[in-house]
């Protein structure tokens, strides 16, 4: 335990570590959460050409939007949808531009485009919500089921796979609860979902020197002469890397959640994620989806940390270690679109390469003839890969130290 605390303090004392943590905090929490809620994302529009033209009043806009959504009764039915669209059209006709900003018009417009494509007027430059006849917006859930079936057919997900996905979808409670959706859509679609991709960069910088730095700092001879030996020190380094990863994640996640609670409160936590993407099959509400996405980031970060520490133990050069570590995450992202679909899915199992937004999709894996919904594997396989790398990191470092 003493060795662990020594290694832990040694890591946190490094200037590069403090700089990385600070930069990531500023990017993910200050800009990606606080200023996004208050200014870039939800501030009232003053200049429609840029988010930077928004007013610094996001908190007020969010609260007004939540209050407005509650006026529609809390359940999403045909009548609710008709009333939302009718109310929007009336405000638009009255020239109430500022009032339109508190509506869920972007979300509702996506529903209309998905469920009522025959009502789209290609000659009209306006969005569907502005001109569609509210009285024709009927059969919401029947149409959703039809669209889902058509999507699965087009995707080649038929037979047993289609029935498997339908079994998952049947657990979704209907009618859907309805409150303000846009905030949760932004939160789950980018704020939390992109956290792991950003963390990977800074984790790579910090952990790449954990083992390789012993040669860079000319301390390898000192490690060989210590009474504890390489084995215990290697274990202490592994535990230090894991502890730093968890602490780093906790700092970002807790700060983001505090920001979220301040701006959004808990309103809408029990809405189904189908309000964001209608053809999603996951029986999850917004809170459950957020918990999954944070778990995805944490477990993916632990898995990535294991890979970085293995590379650091196997390579003496800090820069090469960093480049190889970053290539593990960003390399597959860059080449994925040029690969066959099955290979893309396989690459998604690499830590922090896949996306937590798979809960909105219908992807599956077939392993030994058994169908498995992709989010289950995306949250387990990456951390297992990292854990498996850790013993090899110790052995690799051992061989180099003895040599």
Regions found by a protein language model. Give the residues of each.
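Hydrophobic transmembrane alpha-helix segments characteristic of membrane transport
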Residues: 214-221
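Short hydrophobic, aromatic-rich alpha-helical segments embedded in or entering the lipid bilayer
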Residues: 343-364
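Secretory targeting signals
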Residues: 28-83, 133-214, 235-314, 318, ...
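N-terminal Sec/SRP start-transfer signal
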Residues: 1-23
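Residues that define the loop-to-transmembrane-helix transition and helix capping
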Residues: 18, 231, 318-320
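Short helix-to-coil transition segments within interhelical loops
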Residues: 224-230
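Central hydrophobic cores of alpha-helical transmembrane segments
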Residues: 22-25, 319-332, 350-351
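Junction motif at the cytosolic side of a transmembrane helix
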Residues: 5-7, 11, 310-314, 381-403
